[in-house]
Each structure stands twice: as C-alpha cells, then as structure tokens.
Amino acid sequence: MPDYVNWLRHASPYINSHRDRTFVVMLPGEGVEHPNFGNIVHDLVLLHSLGARLVLVHGSRPQIESRLAARGLAPRYHRDLRVTDAPTLECVIDAVGSLRIAIEARLSMDMAASPMQGARLRVAGGNLVTARPIGVVEGVDYHHTGEVRRIDRKGIGRLLDERSIVLLSPLGYSPTGEIFNLACEDVAMRAAIDLEAEKLILYGAEQGLLDASGKLVRELRPQQVPAHLQRLGNSYQAELLDAAAQACRAGVKRSHIVSYTEDGALLSELFTRTGNGTLVAQEQFEQLREAGIEDVGGLIELIRPLEEQGILVRRSREVLEREIEQFSIVEREGLIIACAALYPIADSEAGELACLAVNPEYRHGGRGDELLERIEERARGLGLKTLFVLTTRTAHWFRERGFQPSSVERLPAARASLYNFQRNSQVFEKSL
C-alpha cells in the first residue's frame, strides 16, 4: 500500500477538525525570500482547499533593509524596534507594496499540472488594521513606527465568509490618515486574538523552540514560556515564542512555531500527531488517567503489535473488557499512546505491574516512568507492600527503576500457580 494512503487516513481527523476554523499565519520577509516560499504557498492553498479560513500576515524586514541600503540610509533601532522617520517610511511603503503584490501574484497562479491548478483563489485585503504611534520611548521618537490599535474583525469575517484568503501587510492606518510601520508578529498576534482564531501559526528560521541542548521542544504551556524567554534573550525565537504565548493567554487555542526553511513543515505540524515544530497551548496535550470501557478498542491497537512479538501476554477483547479497571492510560488527542495495569494478588500484600506499553513514536518522553509512578501510587493506596513484574525483554529498564531480581518462589501462591513456564519470564520485585 502506498505511504500516502496511510497518511491520508491518519490525517482525516485533522482535516475534519480544521474545516471552517480560522487560522492566522505569519510569514516574515525572510520566509518570502527563501527558496521554500513556493512550497509554503502550495501548503497554504491546500489548507484553504480543505476548508480552513486563512489570514496571512507577511513581514518585510529584509526588503526594507535592502531599500534603505540602496538609498544610502542607515537603519535605526531602539529596543529592537525600527525607528521609522519620513525617509524610512518611504522605503517601508515601497517594500511592503512590492512584496504584497508578489505574494498576491504567487497565490493567483493556476498552472496546469501544479498544486495550484484549479485553485482560483481570491486574495483580499484593505484598511483592515487601525494603528497608533508608539511615540517617544526613553527619549527616542519612533516617528511612524506604530502598534496595532484595532483589527477590523467584522470586515475580515465577511471576507473569510466569502472564501477569500485575507492578506494583511505590516502597515496600519490612523483615523487621521497617517501610515504606521508595524511589526508583523504584532499584527498576526492581534489578528488571531481579535478574530478568536483556532490557531496562530508563526514561521521562523528554526524548526521551533530548541532547548539548551539543541533538542526540539515540541509542546509548551504559556506558564512554561517565561523560563525559555529568559534563556533566549533578545533572539527572534524569543519574539515568536512570546507572541505565541500571549495569543494563547488571550484565548487563541493553539499557537505553532514552524520553520520556513523546511518543505512541508506546516502540513506535518497540522496533520500529524507528532507535529513538526513547537506547539504552545492552554489545554492539556496529554492526559494520564484510569481506563474505561470505551478505551478497550484503543488499548487493543496499542498492545496488539507487542503481543504479536511475544513481548506481552495475549489478552482478548473479553479479557480487556473484564479487567479494564486495572488499567491506567496516557491519552493524546484521542489516541491511547501508553498503558499499564495493576493486579492486586489475592491473599497477599502484593500486586503485579503488567502490560506496560508505550507507542513506539512516544518512547522518549518519560511516559513509561509516569505510568510506573501512577501504578505505584495506586498500589500504595490499596495498602500493598510489594510490586512484582514479570518480563521477557525489559529487565534492565525495571532494574534501573529500583526493581530487584526475584524468583517464581517469591511470588504469592495465587500468582505463582498461574506462572507460565513456557514463557520463562524473569521475575522482579520492588518494595513499596
């Protein structure tokens, strides 16, 4: 079976959940200049074709810099924010206008045998962002640099209802007719908040947020963000992360940070469980809870491959239904990705940890340790003093977590009588 068939099947729940939802996507000017820009446009068109309501916010920093350099003007910044005097504003207007036209042209393509064929998109925009001047800060006059005052929620809503892609540029207008240079990150964040968007998607050069060791941080809650901001300092990643967290605190369900350098990053982030970048969300991504009868089907999907490999003892649906209350599970977006069971042993103060399993895609996130801790917690709550485990493949994992080698003779009689000598499982025990 072709790989894309399985991919489509697994993506179908996401396709359904994204339909008719508003997504605000921010692409900085560096992303528009990158060779991957064409692929990003194709991904946005696909997302629109699948029913998402798209608001695209573009940046223009490198384009402005090149125009300043061409005129022999030196860029001025204060607190990492551009000071936009009158000559600079001319460069801003030139850069933003040219870039907007280039983006609209790319979204208007309808070439045969291309991802754009038959798309026939309508790109809409206008004076949808009202701005105000930042003014004077620490003695520095920002002139025509502004901040978002209001997003025309109703106007954008009507355009989205008409199935247009709304394109917002980093310019805002005042009621007195002035033009202000805005940060595209601020425009995107405010648009996502005011439109009550389902998602804010922020493109950056990096795959997402990287921790101190260079490893991708896949998921964060807003309350975890300040510690990372302190570590990142004044970097652009810090700016993106701060915008993502602010949006979530203000009601946006999920913010995503993905790379504009990686082909397909947006689709991988939105249509797979593992994602591709960093997700910031208020809601709990995963839930460790006790299993219920409705979880039997998911448990079977999780443990069946391990049963077929002989790692776990086979359990029929009937057995799982009967013993479901013994199980604790980790659920992620409706998928059971890990489980473990506790069986108190009759006529003893001991219990057996059984059927500990973690989905292969999630085996490096400490979920096995979380389940072990939950099982030990439950065992202590039942007044058990000893926890046994029987294993054929994972002896070292249990030894590293305080289990000591034991024997069949050490098992309570009620469990020893059921020991399968054909499997020849190793016995370990741990004092609680």
From Swiss-Prot:
Domain N-acetyltransferase as annotated: residue spans: 286-425
One Pfam family named in its UniProt record: Acetyltransf_1
Pathway connected to this protein: Amino-acid biosynthesis; L-arginine biosynthesis; N(2)-acetyl-L-ornithine from L-glutamate: step 1/4
GO terms classed as biological process: L-arginine biosynthetic process
Superkingdom as given in the UniProt entry: Bacteria
Main location: cytoplasm
InterPro entries from the UniProt entry: AceGlu_kinase-like_sf, Acyl_CoA_acyltransferase, Asp/Glu/Uridylate_kinase, GNAT_dom, NAGS_kin, NH2A_AcTrfase
Subcellular locations according to the entry: Cytoplasm
Enzyme Commission code: 2.3.1.1
GO molecular function, one term: L-glutamate N-acetyltransferase activity
Record's GO cellular component terms: cytoplasm
Catalytic activity: L-glutamate + acetyl-CoA = N-acetyl-L-glutamate + CoA + H(+)
Keywords tagged on the record: Acyltransferase, Amino-acid biosynthesis, Arginine biosynthesis, Cytoplasm, Transferase
Matches recorded under NCBIfam families: N-Ac-Glu-synth, PRK05279.1
HAMAP family associated with the record: N_acetyl_glu_synth
Family, per entry: Belongs to the acetyltransferase family. ArgA subfamily.
Protein name per Swiss-Prot or TrEMBL: Amino-acid acetyltransferase
